[in-house]
A protein has these predicted regions:
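Alpha-helical membrane insertion/targeting regions
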Residues: 1-217
Length: 217
């Protein structure tokens, strides 16, 4: 059992390291170009490795929080990648989109309940569960709403792709910080990347909205 855990932990670390590097390259590379596409694919499959190895380790050595966060993290990467295949309003959500959204919504709801229970017990880590759960449930619920009533915005796919891929990167970077950053309080290490990353995503969206607006002039 211990050997299996070590093997999957090694895969988990390798996948996480690859995701951090490939994700950074994809973010700075020109969008739609060869380097961005290759780095993006590498990032996506690295995230799949991180999620799969985390789920297996959770079964070998039960850790509920890690299990649900793994689902949330990969859901972000999965939906980000799927948006590149669903650019048109006529591209309806497939069975895998609905399945992933329902799983993510379930994970988000469980994290919220778990967070409330932990706070009730006086454990501040409950806030981490609540924040991750709220994002997970919010994203998945909004996705299902848009499956039924597709958005009218032409570049919706691009902004969703950007938001989800960077969101997954934030989750991976958070895991890196939790393991390596020891000089900050645990709660800050868990939540600061999300706070900073959310502002970063907002700034990036403003930049591209202005860029696309200028291109239409």
């Amino acid at each position: 059992m211990e050997i299996l855990i070590k093997i999957f932990l090694a895969l988990h670390i390798a996948g996480g390291t690859s995701a951090l590097i490939a994700g950074a390259v994809a973010m700075v590379a020109p969008k739609g170009k060869r380097v961005h596409n290759i780095a993006g694919k590498t990032y996506y499959w690295s995230m799949a490795t991180v999620c799969a190895s985390a789920v297996v380790m959770c079964f070998l050595k039960p850790q509920q929080f890690l299990f649900y966060v793994a689902i949330f993290s990969f859901y972000l990467a999965f939906t980000g990648e799927r948006m590149t295949k669903r650019k048109r309003q006529s591209d309806a959500a497939a069975i895998q989109d609905w399945t992933a959204a329902i799983l993510a919504a379930t994970a988000g709801a469980i994290l919220l309940v778990r967070g409330g229970m932990l706070l009730n017990e006086g454990t501040s880590f409950g806030w981490v569960n609540i924040v991750f759960g709220a994002f997970c449930l919010g994203f998945s619920a909004n996705d299902m709403r848009l499956f039924v009533k597709p958005p009218q915005e032409k570049m919706h796919w691009f902004f969703t792709h950007l938001t989800r891929m960077i969101g997954a990167y934030i989750a991976t970077f958070t895991a890196f910080c939790v393991v390596n950053v020891k000089f900050l309080p645990s709660l800050a290490v868990w939540l600061l990347p999300t706070v900073i990353g959310t502002f970063g995503i907002a700034a990036w969206q403003v930049y591209y909205r202005r860029k696309f607006a200028l291109q239409r002039v």
